[in-house]
Amino acid sequence: VGVAAGLSAVGKIPFAHSFGPFITRRACDQIFMSGAYAKLNVKLIGSDPGITAQINGGTHMPFEDMGIMRGIPEMTIVEPTDIAMLKSVMKQMKETYGMYYMRLVRKSCIKVFEDGSEFQIGKAVPLRDGTDVTIIASGYCTAEAIKAADILEKEGIQAKVINMFTWKPIDEEAIIE
C-alpha cells in the first residue's frame, strides 16, 4: 500500500492486490495515512471474501473488510458481480481519481450481464421486479439472491432483487424505492 501511494504521488495509477484481510485489516493505517489522508489515487483490490478462501484457513477469510473500508474517508467501495461488470467498473476506477477498494472472488462466478454492459458506480442495478420483499446483494452473493427469489416465487412471494455493487457511496434512492 505504501508503494502504491508513492506511485500515485508521482502521477501513476496503481492497482494493489492481496487477500481481503491483508489489503484491508493489516494495511488499514497505511491506507488511511498514505492514501486517503493524502488524497491520492490508489486502487485496492481484496480477493476471496468471506468463506470463499476456506481452503486457506481463517487468517485468509475477510469478514470485516467492507466495514473497515467504509470507515475510511473518501473511499469508494465496489463489489462487481460478474466479468462484464468487472470490466466496466475497472475502467471507471482507472478514469476516476481517488481511493477505491474492490472486493473480488478469485474463482469463476455467475454471468448476469451481457458483455459490453456499462454500469455507473454509485447506482444499483435492479435484476428482478417484485412487490412483496426486496433482496439486496452484491458480488458472489448475487447468485444466492437470485436463487432465493426463485424459491420465494414458488411460495407465491414476489421478490425484487437489487444488485448493490457499490457499497460506498451507497445508492440510497434504490434502497428507499
Regions found by a protein language model. Name each.
Residues 144-162:
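Short helix-loop-beta junction
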Residues 162-169:
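Short beta->alpha junction loops
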Residues 6-134, 159:
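Conserved thiamine diphosphate
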Residues 28-29, 145-146, 172-173:
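Conserved strand-to-helix beginnings and helix N-cap segments that scaffold or border functional pockets
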Residues 24, 86, 141-142, 168:
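Alpha-helix N-cap/loop-to-helix initiation residues
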